[in-house]
């Protein structure tokens, strides 16, 4: 058939190549899938497409940050003291860039509703990226996204290694995960917390000459409070979703009856109870129903804060974020601002002191760090 004849056929008669399905379980598939991702998320139509887009964007964010850090450190080493303001401006610019990107991926994750179904199969150990931008793929870059082997006990953390044997001994290089809704909630809560933290930081400017923090954008504190509060709620939904699962197929976070999981720390029934208690206590503290004990004599985690509030009062975290001090309020890096005392509230039956700081101190006292690490794993 001639070319002119083909062009004369109805459009439905011309065979079109179907777009390839996302493949995040092989090295070549990961590269091909991520290279094909659109810049504009508005064209995404399915949950699989949204998840592939979010994963590829997040991995690329890690690449951009790693490259920026490598080149930035090289520049900083040659800067003079009078150039410190330029360094601060560059860091602030990068935080704003990352925050905007986190928001874009968060909005796509919020749209994913898998129900009881499954989505993509992913194999993070196959994601190989030139992270530092030097044009080479080092051993640590080939295995950067690999998952530590699943086991009880203290996980091993350290700087990236160029010893291939290290990864073979301590990492599950072939781990696969069949994504379900609990995995989406896990990723979403991380995005909400990290974006909220960056917004929190950008509420402040740094006065290098006077070594002070300046509350420059109080409205950002209100944004941060809302986003972090949503992260706490998402973590609660994540816990409930994991416990409700009845299958056992290439899981990420798993409940005690699921054994086919690659999550580095096996979670037991008591861990899920602690997860709920922690979320409850953090939630009421975050929303101002419990008060933070910051009176004279407070030790441990709050020792550097005391005394913010007089005896019989506690710090209202919600008020601090939702009714912040005025723009221009300054805080020395060595001394808390007097304006914080206006965030204190009388302790009463409706607003008791939070038991959370004491609980954290008891749980981590004399420990090797496992308790704190588990909290990070569970509650993001």
Report each predicted region and the residues it spans.
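A short, glycine-centered helix-capping/turn motif at helix boundaries
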Residues: 13
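Short, low-complexity, Pro/Ser/Thr/Gly-rich segments in the mature regions of secreted, periplasmic
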Residues: 368-380
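Short helix-capping/linker turns of helical repeat alpha-solenoids
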Residues: 45-50
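Solenoid-like repeat scaffolds
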Residues: 38-44
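Short coil/linker segments at helix-helix boundaries
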Residues: 16-36, 56-359
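Bacterial N-terminal signal peptides
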Residues: 1-10
């Amino acid at each position: 058939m001639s070319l002119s004849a083909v062009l004369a056929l109805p459009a439905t008669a011309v065979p079109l190549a179907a777009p390839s399905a996302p493949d995040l379980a092989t090295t070549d598939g990961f590269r091909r899938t991520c290279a094909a991702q659109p810049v504009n998320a508005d064209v995404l139509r399915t949950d699989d497409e949204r998840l592939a887009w979010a994963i590829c964007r997040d991995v690329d964010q890690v690449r951009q940050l790693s490259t920026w850090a490598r080149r930035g450190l090289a520049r900083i080493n040659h800067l003079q003291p009078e150039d410190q303001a330029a360094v601060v401006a560059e860091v602030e610019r990068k935080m704003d860039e990352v925050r905007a990107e986190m928001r874009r991926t968060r909005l796509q994750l919020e749209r994913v509703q898998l129900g009881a179904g499954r989505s993509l199969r992913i194999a993070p150990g196959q994601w190989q990226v030139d992270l530092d931008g030097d044009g080479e793929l080092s051993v640590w870059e080939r295995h950067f996204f690999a998952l530590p082997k699943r086991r009880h006990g203290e996980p091993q953390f350290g700087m990236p290694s160029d010893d291939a044997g290290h990864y073979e001994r301590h990492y599950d290089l072939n781990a696969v995960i069949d994504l379900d809704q609990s995995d989406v909630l896990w990723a979403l809560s991380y995005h909400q917390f990290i974006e909220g933290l960056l917004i929190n930081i950008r509420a402040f400017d740094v006065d290098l000459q006077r070594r002070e923090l300046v509350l420059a954008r109080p409205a950002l504190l209100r944004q941060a409070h809302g986003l972090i509060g949503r992260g706490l709620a998402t973590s609660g939904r994540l816990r409930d979703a994991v416990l409700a699962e009845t299958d056992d197929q290439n899981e990420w976070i798993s409940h005690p009856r699921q054994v086919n999981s690659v999550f580095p720390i096996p979670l037991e029934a008591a861990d899920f109870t602690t997860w709920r208690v922690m979320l409850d206590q953090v939630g009421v503290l975050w929303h101002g129903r419990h008060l933070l004990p910051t009176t004279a004599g407070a030790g441990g985690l709050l020792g550097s804060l005391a005394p913010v509030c007089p005896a019989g009062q506690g710090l209202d975290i919600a008020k601090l974020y939702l009714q912040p001090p005025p723009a221009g309020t300054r805080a020395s890096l060595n001394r808390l601002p007097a304006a914080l005392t206006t965030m204190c509230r009388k302790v009463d039956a409706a607003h008791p002191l939070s038991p959370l700081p004491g609980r954290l101190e008891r749980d981590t006292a004399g420990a090797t760090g496992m308790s704190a690490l588990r909290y990070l794993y569970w509650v993001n």
